[in-house]
Curated annotation (Swiss-Prot):
GO terms for cellular component: cytosolic small ribosomal subunit. It comes from the Bacteria. This is Small ribosomal subunit protein uS17. Keywords: Ribonucleoprotein, Ribosomal protein, RNA-binding, rRNA-binding. One of its GO terms (biological process) is translation. Pfam families: Ribosomal_S17. GO terms for molecular function: rRNA binding; structural constituent of ribosome. Belongs to the universal ribosomal protein uS17 family.
Length: 90
């Protein structure tokens, strides 16, 4: 009767790794643009998330996709699902 394919209801976000100093954890900065309600100007809002990185493979500057999971620790309820773009080496 209900033969539909199960879809993931977990949220996914794309952001830049700003810190990888912790063991098995990266800090990801998510930026989004919001229109100011009075002035109409678009302003950039940002938020940092701690995400689980089991193999310590991601470096600062990498663009990654994070996915919501069960809480791993007090501040960590996201996991890195894939690398979107590696950091440019200067």
């Amino acid at each position: 009767m209900n033969d539909s394919v199960k879809t993931s209801l977990k949220r996914t976000l794309v952001g830049r790794v700003v810190s990888n100093k912790m063991d098995k954890t990266v800090t990801v900065l998510i930026e989004h643009r919001v229109k100011h309600p009075i002035y109409g100007k678009y302003v950039v809002r940002s938020k940092k998330y701690h995400a689980h990185d089991e193999a310590n493979t991601y470096n600062e500057g990498d663009l990654v996709e994070i996915q919501e999971t069960r809480p791993v620790s007090k501040t960590k309820a996201w996991t890195v699902s894939r690398l979107v773009e590696a950091a440019r080496v200067i």
